[in-house]
Amino acid sequence: MISLFDMFKVGIGPSSSHTVGPMKAGKQFVDDLVEKGLLDNVTRVAVDVYGSLSLTGKGHHTDIAIIMGLAGNEPATVDIDSIPGFIRDVETRGRLLLAQGRHEVDFPKDDGMRFHNGNLPLHENGMQIHAWHDDTVIYSKTYYSIGGGFIVDEEHFGQEATNEVTVPYPFKSAKEMLEYCNSTGLSLSGMVMQNELALHSKKEIEEYFGHVWQTIQACIDRGMNTEGVLPGPLRVPRRASALRRMLVSSDKLSSDPMNVIDWVNMFALAVNEENAAGGRVVTAPTNGACGIVPAVLAYYDHFIESVSPDIYTRYFLAAGAIGALYKMNASISGAEVGCQGEVGVACSMAAAGLAELLGASPEQVCVAAEIGMEHNLGLTCDPVAGQVQVPCIERNAIASVKAINAARMAMRRTSAPRVSLDKVIETMYETGKDMNAKYRETSRGGLAIKVQCD
């Protein structure tokens, strides 16, 4: 059973699969060296990056993330402001301090990080890390970053965890999830809470979701108060701060019945601009789609009622349960199934979370989730210049509004839906697997080859 602590992870931008996952892989590799007593024998480290990680790795800061992981950092706690200086030092000296400064090794600028266009056999996002003693490899590991900041090594790819804790309601489909809700009389969030209580204490759950909400609020606040241009060759101007000023200062806008949409857009833009700048964000379920779940909860907070611990906990539980279904039965990796697995899943999650807060039945929550995905089927992932900016940032805003609409449509429906959530999840996965690789986070097709950098 996937814990919702894993669905909502605090990390850094711009990508969960290409930044958060690779940093975790680097950290895991150096932890292995320490555990096996090999660290002091290492004289050089080399990294090979494959597939989508390679093709869009520079724009997604994959190389930087791996280096910071090897240095002993974790995405949730790394000092973001220290990263540029640390990377400059590594590039200048060709030396890398491993494991929080415990041991220094060679890391040549031209040979320490090698990018390969081909894929490794098990997934589109693959990397190999090698530790050398002089001319001999003394430890090597292959990792796959499978979306949402999740990583798995080659030996455990496709395997279920052997030490899983038994939960009271071990659902693997929406059908099973609804059966548990109907047999117990629990709401969706209430049922999922019982599963989480088998994995974590009540205090741990309260503290974790409190930290997630605080991180989201801080991210929105930074994003809507920061001006300038986002990093990279596109030089995309930040828009959230200007939109906020317009909304706050204009009397004409305040009387516009569509005003709420502008606020939702602003919340989403704020989060995704922070992500694009390498800021602190929450995977929901990925970084590329990290603005949607926050924007919809911020909408509820500003236009329906102030968000309390009970409200954000119920929201995250319902949204996270839907995200877990996609993770278990399909994919949340843009490199595997296109943007429908990122923005599509986030839209589905946010629609479900909002419906839960609005008093929807478990069946209506699943209808909202289904609508949120159905109208994102086939969505491609074609980041311009390999960066999580165009079309990603604006796409989060559009999907946030779509999620709110999906929740409202689900709750006002009087007829039985013809498409189930399980069927739309199955369809999304099959559609993604049929999708040409040009449209799965390789920057080899779509907008990525039509939009030129200055």
Language-model features and meaning:
Residues M1, I12-L55, L122, V152:
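Accessory carbohydrate-recognition regions in carbohydrate-active enzymes
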Residues F8-G26, A277-V296, V337-C347:
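Conserved phosphate/anionic-ligand binding catalytic regions in large, soluble enzymes, centered on
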Residues S17-V34, P294-S306, A351-G359:
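Alpha-helical support elements that line or immediately flank enzyme active sites
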Residues R44-G57, D89-L97, Y315-M328, E370-P383, ...:
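Short, mixed-charge aromatic SLiMs
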Residues P75-L253:
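C-terminal regulatory domains involved in ligand/effector binding and gene-expression control
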Residues H200-G338, G446-D454:
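Accessory "access/gating" subregions that flank catalytic or transport cores
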Residues V307, A318, A324-A397, M409-R418:
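Hydrophobic alpha-helical bundle architecture
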Residues R418-D454:
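Extended hydrophobic packing segments that form well-structured cores
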